[in-house]
């Protein structure tokens, strides 16, 4: 008694130093279930679990890759598998008196956020004389940390259970992302189709796919019926992140 909700965010994400899948299972699958069971036994009414887009087992593609409300989970990585294992067990714990909310977040960014998603693109922008203009129609989903926090608030306020697929107000291409970073770093670098053509020649490499490939949620799948959780739009979010 005394706690209305537990929000579980602890996890081990992709770490090259970890070669034992058992660690992913212990931290990402067994721990959240144990916490949820303890919460339920103690009379807590609501459990919010931060999961991941990785449960779909779909990576970035240079042809684009859109996940919608009909897409089925099929995790491939130890991270995705362990998170999905937790989801399945948590769903069993859900009752009319114990709400379980699962948030399958895409790349989360913001000032101080670990993972280096924006930092990686910022480093490219700083090193390149211009921004390679290519694959501008290939989009990816991202989620600003303040928007994630607002979604959590709304889910708790409305006592909503189920699965949620959040993202910012729009999906963005790598070029859009680098343009926004360049602008907020005071660089305002121009785009180069010539350099983009050279990048396209290297499309067979994993580096190009990682940088320019897309994986996104459909906007329909990301809608929340009880309010707008996007309290900071993408351009402002990048500005706040790089400030």
Labelled PLM ranges:
Residues 25-32, 48, 82-83, 141:
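Short alpha-helix in the Rossmann-fold core of NAD(P)-dependent oxidoreductases
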Residues 110, 132-139, 164-172, 182-185, ...:
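Glycine-rich Rossmann NAD(P)(H)-binding loop
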Residues 151-208, 234-243:
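Mid/C-terminal beta-alpha module of Rossmann-like enzyme folds, strongest
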Residues 26, 61-109, 113:
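Catalytic helix-loop patch of NAD(P)-dependent Rossmann-fold dehydrogenases
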Residues 93-102, 106-141, 145-147:
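NAD(P)-dependent short-chain dehydrogenase/reductase
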Residues 33-78:
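Conserved Rossmann-fold NAD(P)-dependent oxidoreductase catalytic core, especially the SDR/UDP-sugar
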Residues 1-30, 34, 38, 56-58:
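NAD(P)H-binding glycine-rich loop region in Rossmannoid oxidoreductase-like domains
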């Amino acid at each position: 008694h005394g706690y209305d909700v537990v929000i579980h965010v602890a996890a081990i994400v992709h770490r090259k130093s970890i070669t034992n899948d058992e660690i992913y299972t212990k931290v990402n699958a067994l721990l959240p279930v144990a916490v949820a069971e303890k919460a339920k036994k103690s009379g807590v009414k609501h459990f919010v679990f931060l999961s991941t887009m990785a449960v779909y087992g779909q990576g970035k593609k240079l042809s684009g890759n859109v996940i919608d409300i009909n897409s089925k989970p099929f995790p491939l990585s130890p991270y995705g598998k362990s998170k999905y294992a937790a989801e399945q067990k948590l769903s069993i714990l859900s009752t009319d008196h114990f709400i379980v909310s699962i948030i399958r977040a895409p790349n989360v960014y913001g000032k101080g956020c670990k993972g280096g998603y924006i930092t990686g693109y910022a480093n490219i922008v700083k090193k390149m004389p211009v921004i390679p203009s290519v694959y501008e129609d290939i989009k990816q989903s991202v989620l600003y940390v303040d928007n994630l926090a607002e979604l959590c608030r709304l889910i708790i306020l409305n006592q909503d259970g189920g699965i949620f697929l959040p993202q910012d107000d729009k999906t963005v291409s790598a070029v859009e992302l680098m343009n926004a970073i360049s602008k907020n770093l005071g660089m305002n670098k121009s785009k180069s189709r010539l350099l983009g053509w050279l990048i396209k020649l290297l499309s067979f490499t994993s580096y190009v796919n990682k940088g320019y490939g897309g994986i996104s949620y459909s906007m329909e799948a990301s809608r929340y019926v009880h309010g707008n959780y996007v309290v900071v739009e993408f351009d402002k979010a990048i500005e706040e992140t790089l400030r």
